[in-house]
Amino acid sequence: MSIEERVKKIIVDQLGVKAEDVKPEASFIEDLGADSLDTVELVMALEEEFDIEIPDEEAEKITTVQSAIDYVAKANA
């Protein structure tokens, strides 16, 4: 599975949304119905899946599907 596929799977699992709704431009809060707790849990799941640490100031910038994919890809580069 690619990084993009793994990130999307985590989003589907964490937020309970349909895979077809997880588009690159989708906002976790506005488009996928997440709240602040959901976004914290999502960041923790990304950290665990990819064995990375995402500082709070960086986590605040991860607001869309694409921003999560980009961050993880950069962290794994």
UniProtKB/Swiss-Prot annotation:
The modification O-(pantetheine 4'-phosphoryl)serine is found at residue 36. One of its GO terms (cellular component) is cytosol. It holds the Pfam family PP-binding. Keywords: Cytoplasm, Fatty acid biosynthesis, Fatty acid metabolism, Lipid biosynthesis, Lipid metabolism, Phosphopantetheine, Phosphoprotein. Residues 1-76 form the Carrier domain. 4'-phosphopantetheine is transferred from CoA to a specific serine of apo-ACP by AcpS. This modification is essential for activity because fatty acids are bound in thioester linkage to the sulfhydryl of the prosthetic group. GO terms for molecular function: acyl binding; acyl carrier activity; phosphopantetheine binding. It comes from the Bacteria. One of its GO terms (biological process) is lipid A biosynthetic process. It is found in: Cytoplasm. Carrier of the growing fatty acid chain in fatty acid biosynthesis. Belongs to the acyl carrier protein (ACP) family. NCBIfam families: acyl_carrier, PRK00982.1-2, PRK00982.1-3, PRK00982.1-4, PRK00982.1-5. This is Acyl carrier protein. The gene is acpP.
